[in-house]
Amino acid sequence: MFPWGLSCLSVLGAAGTALLCAGLLLSLAQHLWTLRWMLSRDRASTLPLPKGSMGWPFFGETLHWLVQGSRFHSSRRERYGTVFKTHLLGRPVIRVSGAENVRTILLGEHRLVRSQWPQSAHILLGSHTLLGAVGEPHRRRRKVLARVFSRAALERYVPRLQGALRHEVRSWCAAGGPVSVYDASKALTFRMAARILLGLRLDEAQCATLARTFEQLVENLFSLPLDVPFSGLRKGIRARDQLHRHLEGAISEKLHEDKAAEPGDALDLIIHSARELGHEPSMQELKESAVELLFAAFFTTASASTSLVLLLLQHPAAIAKIREELVAQGLGRACGCAPGAAGGSEGPPPDCGCEPDLSLAALGRLRYVDCVVKEVLRLLPPVSGGYRTALRTFELDGYQIPKGWSVMYSIRDTHETAAVYRSPPEGFDPERFGAAREDSRGASSRFHYIPFGGGARSCLGQELAQAVLQLLAVELVRTARWELATPAFPAMQTVPIVHPVDGLRLFFHPLTPSVAGNGLCL
């Protein structure tokens, strides 16, 4: 018995020694890893690196970030301040929030920082896109795309967008069961982008097939840049090539159309604008531009649309105020055509043919609707931030940002900490954007509200996105009422795009026109 006891003690002692050695090695490795990044500071600058942790060797804090989501950034902001360092996805990162700090980053494009996209995104989207362009090519392409989102172009888009949104809301009411709003919004935004922006002639089956192919491309956009069988990049390349093959036929038709004809959609405008600048766009350029437009409109607009539906459901007082404003503007009456019978097997009813009653001018008069849309984008911005790479070492808030390091500016954190609004930033308060509080915001509020970024890379399609959300709000409020199909509101996932974890499952019910004809009743 005694020898057996000694044997057990020996095993335990050996195990303890092994664990102690492993712990010491891990501690030493972490210390050396931290030292390695401390020594990477620019010694020509007397400023220190920002506070923060570089995590574990090679992995950095990536695992913490993936598990904690938005809490990862907020906890470190509380601990280290509005500028801190970390290590994510294999790169050293400086996380930045706060209006003044973000202003420095956004206005420093081409001078202090440049846009940063993963290599896989460059491979899949191509070399002729605005996202990957820098310097003069970026300015030239931005000038061409600016016409796609000009006021004249938006005037042409709005009636067709309203028709698509009206049809969609009526189909939700006719569904006869719960609707996954996020999934439905993704399908809707793809259809609108493909048919209205790009002018593609697609039936429902073709649109659904192309949407699935496009979603496969987007899902693999941020993958390891390894083109090997079964890799994410290989799947993305296959999806991209399928999209390009489909687009090629439609683009060929446009290239051979009458050059003097008035452009009718975004692809027409891109072709005409390039020709006016003395450049004949190639087929490859146009295919990549078309995919980029789809990418820009897809997830972000679907995310914002879902957030709009969610926040209105949580705040019925806002619905009542929107309804009052619509009645005051003579827009309270919805399309009087009854949607298809609930639960019918025929699917969504055909378009009723009612004339669109909204224009950019009419939307401009809906001040409270505009405030609601802005508040949705402030509280739940679709994208949490943007990435840049430091072109040279520069100062930010008393710290050095070393050349070559990644810089991530945070949209969400900046909105959450903005002090220019009278009401608490965590609450839903559309009135914060009303005229009554305009003086309290002042000119300094420009970089406190940045759902579309800012500077040289601000979103060109922001007015179109806001118009889509305004149109959706109007059609929802005067057409339907909606309620949860689940016991409680879903949690929100924030990485990579803000969306409810369950897709937001809701029941939609049609409203009936009031007898008076100037309002709506249940």
Swiss-Prot record:
One of its GO terms (biological process) is negative regulation of retinoic acid receptor signaling pathway. InterPro entries: Cyt_P450 (IPR001128), Cyt_P450_CS (IPR017972), Cyt_P450_E_grp-IV (IPR002403), Cyt_P450_sf (IPR036396). Its cofactor is heme. It catalyses: an organic molecule + reduced [NADPH--hemoprotein reductase] + O2 = an alcohol + oxidized [NADPH--hemoprotein reductase] + H2O + H(+); all-trans-retinoate + reduced [NADPH--hemoprotein reductase] + O2 = all-trans-4-hydroxyretinoate + oxidized [NADPH--hemoprotein reductase] + H2O + H(+); all-trans-4-hydroxyretinoate + reduced [NADPH--hemoprotein reductase] + O2 = all-trans-4-oxoretinoate + oxidized [NADPH--hemoprotein reductase] + 2 H2O + H(+); 9-cis-retinoate + reduced [NADPH--hemoprotein reductase] + O2 = 9-cis-4-hydroxyretinoate + oxidized [NADPH--hemoprotein reductase] + H2O + H(+). Its main location: membrane. It is an enzyme of class 1 (oxidoreductase). This is Cytochrome P450 26C1. It comes from Homo sapiens (Human).
